[in-house]
From Swiss-Prot:
Homodimer. GO terms for molecular function: 8-amino-7-oxononanoate synthase activity; pyridoxal phosphate binding. Pyridoxal 5'-phosphate binds at residues 178, 206, 232. Catalyzes the decarboxylative condensation of pimeloyl-[acyl-carrier protein] and L-alanine to produce 8-amino-7-oxononanoate (AON), [acyl-carrier protein], and carbon dioxide. The modification N6-(pyridoxal phosphate)lysine is found at residue 235. The gene is bioF. It catalyses: 6-carboxyhexanoyl-[ACP] + L-alanine + H(+) = (8S)-8-amino-7-oxononanoate + holo-[ACP] + CO2. Keywords: Biotin biosynthesis, Pyridoxal phosphate, Transferase. This is 8-amino-7-oxononanoate synthase. The lineage of its organism: Bacteria, Pseudomonadati, Pseudomonadota, Gammaproteobacteria, Enterobacterales. GO terms for biological process: biotin biosynthetic process. Belongs to the class-II pyridoxal-phosphate-dependent aminotransferase family. BioF subfamily. Substrate binds at residues 21, 131, 349. Its EC number is 2.3.1.47. Its cofactor is pyridoxal 5'-phosphate.
Amino acid sequence: MSWQQRIEQALAERRLNAAYRRRQTTEGGNGRQIRLGDRLYLNFSGNDYLGLSQDARVIAAWQQGARYGVGNGGSGHVTGFSAAHQALEEQLAAWLGYPRALLFISYAANQAVLAALMQKGDRILADRLSHASLLEAAGAVAGRRAPVPAQSTAGLARICLAKPCDGQRLAVTEGLFSMDGDGAPLAELHRLTRAAGAWLMVDDAHGIGVRGEQGRGSCWQQGVRPELLVATFGKAFGVSGAAVLCDEATAEYLLQFARHLIYSTAMPPAQACALQAALARIREGDDLRARLQDNIRRFRQGAAPLALTLTDSDTAIQPLLVGDNQRALDLATRLRECGLWVSAIRPPTVPPGGARLRLLLTAAHQSQDIDRLLEVLNDVSQ
């Protein structure tokens, strides 16, 4: 089979299984509403949980950061570590209660940590529902990967405590699972890993900013401080990028051995300025978190009497389970015809038979937006 044949066969299989992905060109930002062509939609597909991507202070901070120019021209190990980057790292570490924070490009944070830390003989205990960046890295690094059923403390205990391991063990999970909207039992997981002399790494992409005191996230909410915490900035922060929170020695180790960090151009300083402004708004953002919770409650209460199959989620992620790929696409199309932008999620992002509409609620949504969503969902589910 030639290269071209292999590529065309893979594309044909995606089309046959109604799993083919297509990008859509939007205009005018990605907030409460989204514009495609000449039509405006209510946006229920974005991760901008607190609406900070459109926040005037965050935008102004980015504009003021233009004094640095539009890019770094190098890695943070060369010329790319500015005063803006340093200030952001220090503020994040102080806020989340860690000695150090290191800035990364979003997807690369998980990849970098696992690639740098894991060696032959080590074992990664990877939650099956973890983000693709974690699972991909877990399968590619030197350590052996041991899949753990989602939220299975019993499964983790069996693998972590009972099976011998020549090297070190690292359990990786998410604070909130991005496709189901539920959370991992972090306190119990950390108790098990500590008892076994293992480390716990938590990617809290969907919890940072919206859970816990001052939005410090899922770990803070559960009274847990994992050895490695990944905070990403593309959700509640409304920007992009990520940070790894850890102890002093681990930070220095990553600076020496994390190739994704060493050999990548650092994020623009203006982005670091915007992230500082977003962090300040998150820390004082009880009003935004309360508004988000109000919208979640309004949706859950309104959906209860409807013929909808929802997961048991009390978060901004509200999956409507459909099962069949084509039916999920058809429902998404009908919602868009009614002015609602909702994405159909299909395998391989979710397991086979797990196609769904992933409804994402934000603090920017208004009460009438939630009511309109419920009205249309009721109509299309008949």
